[in-house]
Amino acid sequence: LYDLDKVISWTCSKFKNPEITLLGHSRGGGISMLKASSDTRIKNVVSWASPSNFLNRMPEDRINLWKEKGVVFVYNGRTKQNMPLYLQFYTDCIEHKEKLNMQKAVSNLSIPQLIIHGDSDPTVLVKEAKDLHKWNPKSELFILKDANHVFGAFHPYNIEKLPTDLQFVVDKTIFFINQ
């Protein structure tokens, strides 16, 4: 959130009255929603396949291992890598529980919000998108049939045309921002 604030402040110092939309995918969408709820410079917020809680998918035994080792690894199916998730993330979430309360943040949003999620997302379940929408009934929720967590993209992506699902998500987002 600190880094995002610095980027927004820089943008506001370089452009007169910028119309800022925050857009984030997965955890980035969560960070965007948290920031948008507390920053009047933000005009819209869009989340793609974003969690409604940063820690709700971490079982207790995994948290204990995290505390013991200082790091857990999360497999990224697109890149085939085990991505490190350091204990600092967990301790930040615990120490700043109130500031990182997604339900409270989303409930307090007074700007336009678009939530997009695939109903075949194995990483962040579609229930989380429905929770976000429930907490802000004024939000626009769009659930894309048969779409996964990355809307058909993969890594490395070496094709000029976007996957059909991702192109639809991009088009929907642009339409939302331009309303």
What name fits each language-model region?
Residues 40-88:
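Hydrolase active-site cap/lid region
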Residues 111, 125-134:
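Short alpha-helix in the alpha/beta-hydrolase fold that links the catalytic acid
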Residues 120-124, 149:
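Acidic catalytic loop of the alpha/beta-hydrolase fold
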Residues 29-39:
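Short glycine-enriched nucleophile-adjacent loop
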Residues 108-109, 115-117, 121:
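Short beta-strand/loop motif that positions the catalytic acidic residue
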Residues 1-14:
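Alpha/beta-hydrolase active-site loop
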Residues 150-151, 155-179:
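Catalytic active-site module of serine/aspartate enzymes centered on a nucleophile-bearing elbow/loop
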Residues 15-26:
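Alpha/beta-hydrolase fold nucleophile elbow
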